Curated annotation (Swiss-Prot):
GO BP term (any one): negative regulation of vascular wound healing
Keyword presence, Acetylation: no
GO molecular function, one term: serine-type endopeptidase inhibitor activity
Keywords annotated in UniProt: Protease inhibitor, Serine protease inhibitor, Virulence
Gene3D superfamilies: Alpha-1-antitrypsin, domain 1, Antithrombin, subunit I, domain 2
Site (Reactive bond): R319, N320
Species this protein is from: Myxoma virus (strain Lausanne) (MYXV)
Higher taxonomy: Viruses, Varidnaviria, Bamfordvirae, Nucleocytoviricota, Pokkesviricetes
Endpoints of the signal sequence: none
Record's protein name: Serine proteinase inhibitor 1
Family: Belongs to the serpin family. Poxviruses subfamily.
Cytoplasm in keyword set: no
Top-level taxon of origin: Viruses
């Protein structure tokens, strides 16, 4: 039995709720996490056109397309071993739907990893220099790559001169982080969920089709467990403009996530079963199944956003007139496409780099904020 490896690589943003539900299983209360619901569902949409029968029914992800731009680019590539016969109608649909062609490679060759890495590096203009570190299993016959990249700056940047070292409180540990600070007119609101209070604030990007939702709760885990698309849309509908002082850490997070277990718990099972997988829509041999679903995601947030910008808008008003949004404890962020409410990237920040106080005596951490 041959098998297919599904690899998702993202660097930095609805899909059916499967993307948000998956985050419930990859969330880690003791570490920072970044994940792309759109990256996962866009890859599954490719897999779905190759599937038939119950395998197709389980991969139930409707199309949710965010148009490419110089600020946002989604890349889907399919690498197929030269020995695997493909149905012409499948290759035609793949090329038509995703504006690229199936790439033929020899997976049992010694340089296949370098060939794929070089191809992706060229296609992304160097933004994704490497997608494969370890060698692939020599029995691999297909590899699906989904790459989602977003580069944009805040509509109103944070002034770097206001960035200072501040405490970040997480459980029994206090970290020292670089905390950004600005005053702006933003959409914000305070909500309550299962007796957990939390605020949601929208931080718009310069390109107005995307924005970040900053969610600062009293109990982050409770919000993660309740998260779905209807809740996100509820936030968006009910936020109101207010003059806010936003205090949040600069952060850089990279996550490598194995999504197989999460997808199986959400009902995508036949695709991973050698005896039940049906990918006969792609190949008449119909002897493929999925063994891996890996997603590598990265995001950076600083005073400018993710690219340089000269916009600065700081308004001085009486401090007692401000709504204070202070993310000095574990929080969630979601970057979404406003026309479609598609969640492109999301993540949680639960720790900083340097411990300055620990009631349990720990004195070291490895993640960076």
């Amino acid at each position: 039995m041959k098998y297919l490896v599904l690899v998702l690589c993202l660097t930095s943003c609805a899909c059916r709720d499967i993307g948000l539900w998956t985050f419930r299983y990859v969330y880690n209360e003791s570490d920072n996490v970044v994940f792309s619901p759109y990256g996962l569902t866009s890859a599954l949409s490719v897999l779905r056109i190759a599937a038939g029968g119950n395998t197709k029914r389980e991969i139930d992800v409707p199309e949710s397309v965010v148009e490419d731009s110089d600020a946002f680019l989604a890349l889907r590539e399919l690498f197929v071993d030269a020995s695997v016969p493909l149905r012409p109608e499948f290759t035609a649909e793949f090329s038509s739907r995703f504006n690229t062609s199936v790439q033929r490679v020899t997976f049992n060759s010694e340089n296949v990893k370098d060939v794929i890495n070089s191809y992706v590096k060229d296609k992304t203009g160097g933004d994704v220099p490497r997608v494969l570190d370890a060698s692939l299993d020599r029995d691999t016959k297909m590899l699906l790559l989904s790459s989602v990249r977003m580069k944009t700056s805040w509509r109103h940047v944070f002034d770097p001169s206001f960035t200072t070292d501040q405490p970040f409180y997480s459980g029994n540990v206090t970290y020292k982080v670089r905390m950004m600070n600005k005053i702006d007119t933003l959409k914000t609101e305070t909500f309550t969920l299962r007796n957990v209070g939390y605020s949601v604030t929208e931080l718009p990007y310069k390109r107005r089709q995307t924005a970040m939702l900053l969610v600062v709760p009293d109990d982050l885990g409770e919000i993660v467990r309740a998260l779905d698309l209807s809740l996100v849309r509820f936030w968006i509908r009910n936020m109101r403009k207010d003059v806010c002082q936003v205090v949040m850490p600069k952060f850089s997070v990279e996550s490598v996530l194995d999504l197989r277990d999460a997808l199986q718990r959400l009902g995508v099972r036949d695709a991973f079963d050698p005896s039940r997988a049906d990918f006969g829509q792609a190949s008449p041999s119909n002897d493929l199944y999925v063994t891996k679903v890996l997603q590598t995601s990265k995001i950076e947030a600083d005073e400018r956003g993710t690219t340089a910008s000269s916009d600065t808008a700081i308004t001085l008003i009486p401090r007692n007139a401000l709504t204070a949004i202070v993310a000095n404890k574990p929080f969630m962020f979601l970057i979404y496409h406003k026309p479609t409410t598609t969640v492109l990237f999301m993540g949680t920040i639960t720790k900083g780099e340097k411990v300055i106080y620990d009631t349990e005596g720990r004195d070291d951490v490895v993640s960076s904020v």
